[in-house]
């Protein structure tokens, strides 16, 4: 589901709200979440999961075109950990041998 699809579905489900208001709400929520993560804060949405930053240490990578070794610096990357309710909901829907992709 894309952001546009999410906005469209929410606008249909919440018919009393204008589509522009739903669009603004979703974009504001995502902007606030991005800002919190950028500030190093953890975001927890009970029943859904939590977003945090994980540190990736410096490492040696390769340029795929030339095969040349390249030193990659350490960095922080966003990480999502699903909550128990979300894990249970997803595991009950998909059979174990199904490929979600």
Swiss-Prot record:
InterPro entries tied to this protein: Hist_DNA-bd, Histone-like_DNA-bd_CS, IHF-like_DNA-bd_dom_sf, IHF_beta
UniProt keyword terms in alphabetical order: DNA recombination, DNA-binding, Transcription, Transcription regulation, Translation regulation
The keyword Ligase is annotated on this UniProt entry: no
GO MF annotation terms: DNA binding; structural constituent of chromatin
SUPFAM superfamilies listed in its UniProt record: IHF-like DNA-binding proteins
GO cellular component, one term: cytosol
Gene Ontology BP term (one): regulation of translation
SMART domains: BHL
Region ranges (Disordered): 62-84
Gene3D superfamilies: IHF-like DNA-binding proteins (4.10.520.10)
Entry-linked HAMAP family: IHF_beta
Task performed by this protein: This protein is one of the two subunits of integration host factor, a specific DNA-binding protein that functions in genetic recombination as well as in transcriptional and translational control.
Annotated PANTHER family: DNA-BINDING PROTEIN HU, INTEGRATION HOST FACTOR SUBUNIT BETA
Family stated for the protein in its record: Belongs to the bacterial histone-like protein family.
Assembly and binders: Heterodimer of an alpha and a beta chain.
Protein name: Integration host factor subunit beta
Origin species: Stenotrophomonas maltophilia (strain K279a)
């Amino acid at each position: 589901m894309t952001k546009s699809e999410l906005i469209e579905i929410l606008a249909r489900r919440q018919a009393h709200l204008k589509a522009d208001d739903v669009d603004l709400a979703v974009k504001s929520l995502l902007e606030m979440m991005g800002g919190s993560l950028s500030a190093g804060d953890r975001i927890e949405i009970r029943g859904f999961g939590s977003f945090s930053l994980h540190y990736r240490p410096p490492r040696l990578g390769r340029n795929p075109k030339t095969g040349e070794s390249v030193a990659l610096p350490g960095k922080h990357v966003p990480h999502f950990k699903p909550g128990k309710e979300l894990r249970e909901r997803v595991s009950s829907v998909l059979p174990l041998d199904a490929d979600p992709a």
